[in-house]
Amino acid sequence: MSEHYIEFRGVSKAFDEHVVLDDVSFFVNHGETVVIMGRSGVGKSVALKHIMGFLKPDSGRVIVAGEDITDWNESQLAEIRRKVTMVFQSGALFDSLTVGENIAFPLQTREGITGEQIDARVAELAEMLEVADVLDKVPSEISTGTKRAVAIARALAQDPEAILYDEPTTMVDPLMAAHTSDLILKLKETLHKTSIVVTHDTHLGKKLADRLVFLHEGKVAFFGPWLEFESSQESFLRNFRLQDELIPALDVTT
């Protein structure tokens, strides 16, 4: 079995002649958390959509769970999407369902699972993600940060091998962003799942990254350990770090 769970091999993607990904190569090992960073519009979320099979590259190969999924059809991709789940920036919750029903939704079509087992799994995840007190509420009755936690719980419902987070701390206040990052860190340390986190937040990146992919003008400008990123003197990397150093990180544990 390959050490790499996810791998990009020279992936390129353009939209209307605008190149978003340009010969991008990186890998994520089993159980590792890789953070993808870069300024807005450099293709961070586009990379995640390739892993899920929502987009296909113009060139290059995408490997997931030891399989080259580049040319797979929707039926084949359904198998990968049971192994890899994605937490969208919007949360993508069902407005008409309660929080508990949203978390349970991926399990409803699973064969061989009873209602009692579904209820137990929902309770377990609600406790883990600290949303047990809102299980009977609908999404419109909870905060954006709580919606993110519910979306993460739903993504974990089927016990996937890997989870992709798309900007998990955006559009929330700093305190909730810090709380969300602490929840993701707790999951990293307890579940040890293969993970990719897309973010522009260096505080979150430093907290979570085993290694970092930094995209610049559609290319991989840096791929390696966080400490090497922090010490790099490349001007665009240094400038990116400096912009976040102006915003103090919050520690909700103190």
Regions picked out by a protein language model, each given a short descriptive name:
Residues 52:
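Helix-to-loop junction immediately C-terminal to a conserved catalytic motif
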Residues 68, 116-133:
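Conserved ABC ATPase "signature" region
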Residues 97-105:
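Short coil-to-helix segment of the ABC ATPase nucleotide-binding domain corresponding to the Q-loop/switch region
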Residues 138-142, 146:
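Conserved ABC ATPase signature
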Residues 159:
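Conserved catalytic motifs of ABC-family nucleotide-binding domains
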Residues 163-166:
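Catalytic Walker B motif of ABC-type/P-loop ATPase nucleotide-binding domains
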Residues 227-254:
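C-terminal boundary and immediately downstream tail of ABC-type ATPase nucleotide-binding domains
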